[in-house]
Amino acid sequence: VFWNFHERQPGEFDFSGQADVAEFVRLAQEEGLYVILRPGPYACAEWDFGGYPSWLLKEKNMVYRSKDPRFLEYCERYIKALGKQLAPLTVNNGGNILMVQVENEYGSYAADKEYLAALRDMIKDAGFNVPLFTCDGGGQVEAGHIDGALPTLNGVFSEDIFKIIDKYHPGGPYFVAESYPAW
């Protein structure tokens, strides 16, 4: 889910037409598919500005991907709006959303556990009552992992996944969030 697709203007959310992510999730359920939701707020995915809305650039001296209070306020507004659309569609509510990701590859950027904890709490407070997870490369799990979220790895599957995940969550589950067969 890309934040900039749903909040093109500050405080104005669009979940209609092509932006109707709830309809997409329901369609997946009709087809017998489950959804692993990755709401960001930073999505990366080689998407413009990592999925952040461009209007954030007007905020002078605001630090992105941090516990900057202004940034967190905008993140919370977005996560709450997304929760109204999608939290009713979790598997615990009869839907098909299995898991929700907290941030994206944060360990390669910084190690601000307070920021990650704030996002984790926002996601829970928005009604997402399914397991949460983080995803990082093997060498960045320490910085990107947060209590209350399963650590997952990005990259190519190898035996190292067991050792790395066991360090933070003994016994798994073992999950490669992004598999790179070629780059």
What are these model-predicted stretches?
Residues 22-29, 80-84, 98:
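A broadly conserved amphipathic alpha-helix scaffold signal in soluble, globular proteins
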Residues 1-48, 120-125:
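Aromatic-lined substrate-binding rim segments of carbohydrate-active enzymes
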Residues 37, 42-74, 82-183:
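Substrate-binding/catalytic cleft of secreted carbohydrate-active enzymes
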